[in-house]
A protein has these predicted regions:
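Short, low-complexity N-terminal intrinsically disordered segments enriched in polar/charged residues
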Residues: 1-24, 28, 32, 36
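Alpha-helix initiation/capping motif
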Residues: 4-7, 45, 49, 97
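A solvent-exposed, acidic/Ser-Thr-rich amphipathic alpha-helical stretch
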Residues: 27-88
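A beta-strand edge to alpha-helix "cap/lid" segment located at domain peripheries
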Residues: 61-130
Length: 130
């Protein structure tokens, strides 16, 4: 689907909202940016992709996640069928003062509540390994 300008604004807001929800520890609000059946693929950090809002919330609530998230450089593009793609960059501040940078590749679907991320794949760009 080719996104309209209005779609692009809403999708950019949805992608950026992820960082606010994470940093506010408002995991009960994940449904504002993810679909019920969302896939969070952070396998670059080890482990398997996590599927579904409840499982993603539990995973994000576990120790070891970044303390601050900053989403930038959001680019929205056409996706297959009813989907739209977004690519953004993330800067995360880690416990102990470290920094990590990532690229997020998102698939988004329009729901009754607006655009939501149905799949997020994370690519670590710095450091090279965790």
């Amino acid at each position: 689907m080719k996104p309209t300008n209005e779609d692009t604004v809403e999708i950019s807001r949805t992608v950026a909202l992820w960082a606010h929800i994470m940093d506010d520890h408002a995991l009960d609000r994940l449904g504002e940016c993810l679909t019920e059946d969302a896939v969070w693929d952070g396998s670059v950090f080890g482990g398997d992709p996590v599927v579904g809002l409840d499982a993603i919330a539990a995973f994000m609530n576990a120790p070891g996640h970044a303390k601050a998230h900053h989403t930038t450089n959001i680019v929205v593009s056409e996706g297959p069928g009813d989907e739209v793609r977004a690519r953004s960059k993330g800067l995360s501040l880690l416990e102990g003062g470290g920094v990590a940078t990532v690229v997020y590749d998102d698939d988004l679907r329009r729901t009754d509540d607006g655009w939501r991320i149905s799949r997020r794949v994370i690519h670590l760009t710095w450091p090279q390994r965790f």
